Amino acid sequence: VIENHSNESHSNERPLGVAAVVLAAGAGERFAGQRHKLLCEVDGVPLVRRAVDAALAAGLDETIVVMGAVDLLGVLPDEVTVLHNEAWQQGQATSLAAAVNYAGSRGHRGVVFGCGDQPGVPTEAWVAIGHADSDLAVAEFNGARRPPVKIGAALWSHLPLSGDEGGRVLLRRRPELVKAIACEGNPDDIDTLEDLKKWNSTTLLR
């Protein structure tokens, strides 16, 4: 279900054919706060908004947010396309599947996906992965491979349709296709209330 759609590339250049996808449908069950973690603030901004703004600023052809467990419309910018994943309880793979199905209908030839709970992934990482000359590219932060991950349309049919593994399945099964790109930033996700408190108490990589 498309909740709203007002996002187009703002660039005057020829379209890249790649959309950014922020996965933000999970329940965040490990987070013991009074609100869903994606609505909690990091540096005065809702966590999911921090991640979405970084993706949107990359200037890819479209920025898509997949939500499910909690309504995020009130904190998202108007420029994004919001998809509601009604099957979110079946795992993150369902959100990625919903995104690539939509991206295919829009004529995109690839998607770059990241997570809504990673506030330290900068726009530059989205740009680098989005422009990678490979159908399977992943950001590498100090040697650790983490989202954003680019998946070309030729590989979409190989993605799982359910479960908590999405792009990781391809990275593991098709290592010969993977292009790892060194990126600056902090790929840590906010899973617990302690993670949030730690992030907000330090100025590291802000």
Each PLM stretch: what is its role?
Residues 14-145, 175-183:
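Nucleotide and nucleotide-moiety/phosphate-recognizing core
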Residues 146-157, 193:
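Conserved nucleotide-sugar donor-binding
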Residues 144-146, 151, 166, 185:
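A conserved catalytic-core signature of glycosyltransferases
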Residues 41, 120, 150, 189-190:
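Short aromatic/basic micro-patch
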Residues 2-3, 12-16, 157, 162-206:
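Conserved alpha/beta core of the MobA/IspD/sugar-nucleotide pyrophosphorylase nucleotidyltransferase superfamily
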